[in-house]
Amino acid sequence: MKSSKRKICQVLALLVSSIGATAAMAAGPVIQGGGSSLVAPTLGSVSNTATEIGLYGTANATFTYYSVGSGAGQNAFLNNQPTFFGAGVTGTVHFANSDAALSTAQLTAYKAGLGTTSGPLIQIPYIVTPITVPVVNGPAVTSTTTPQTTPGQAHSIALNDNDLCGIFSGKLTNWNQVVNPETGSAYALNAPIKVIYRSDGSGTTELLTRHLAAVCTTLNTQTGVTFVDSLTFTASFPGGAVPANFVAASGSGGVRTQLANLSSAGTSAVAYLSPDYTNTFLAPSSTVVTAAGALQLPVASLVNAKNGAYYAPTYANASTALGTVTPPTTKLLASNPANWVPNAGNPAAGYPVSGTSQIILSQCYANASVKSAVQDFLNKHYTNAGFVSIVHGNGFDTVPSNYQTAISNDFLSNASGFNLDIGNASVCTGTVTGR
């Protein structure tokens, strides 16, 4: 009996020791953020080491990301209101990701309000992204010159700005109205086109409409439609009313689901998505499209009107579209979050619908462990080879090297001497207690 009791005690001791070790491994604060569904598969979760949060682990902190769309992410951060992430979410909003830049009005209001105690807001580019144009049950690909965009398909259907403006405004509603830029003639396919658009506040929408606002005219756009750079797709339509062939979907996942359903039904459809929701040619490591039986969405190549070249929506072509951009070089310029977002609405070269997705942070955090973990995570995101591999595997590119250097010198350290770095003691003091 005594021997049995000793064995039970030994087992209990091992269990307690194991629990203690697990707790130690998961030491540190919970850091939560959310927003852009575009970057959600890249950020991921602690349970998936093929994502940034999973690769980071839980030794210093546990990061949690809610995929709710860029608009909701912005609102969550600007108000420090976690219910924008979900009805039952509580605690502090430590960061947000948004493909759309914050407006001047949003930045001004934050500075005058929550920023007085939380500290200055930081907005920096997180990744470079193309916005793809998936096409299901579209015209047969007959080209021998357009680039590959889809697994098992050497070439792609091609679209130009007139096609994009016509389709996304409702002027062109059948493939036999859409002109093939290679031949100058309409596609032969007689099939009505469904257009899938984001119903939520979407940075993916903002990147698309930024381009459409730059290139669409009264000649190639449906009467009454004027594209505006907005997170809300319907903002470009009179009274917010879209044509009957348009179908709303919430989140990038919702758009993909609609396309998959229409593909199975034999219905032709066009949409806009980040590469990680499309196929494994563009995003070979995406957790969305690597699952067994996952649909590989066909994607169009686009003509760049400035140089006449056809581009696939690869991360390299998105970086080409960004061009030679320079980050802010003085303290006055660098202290304005609006100056950190490059504009590639109508690029001279590269894939025409490209841009950056941003991460939004606070300069001051009340918990020193949160501050340290946020800095550590961002350092790894921008410089660690494993993190870079995850970014590329989801179809995105890292920000230009001059931006990486400036971000490191200005925000992740104080090498620049601008006192903009996270947790700077001369800023995060007194009534500025941090969030």
List where the protein language model places each region.
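Gram-negative bacterial Sec-dependent N-terminal signal peptides
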Residues: M1-A26
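Flexible loop/hinge segments at secondary-structure junctions
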Residues: A26-R435
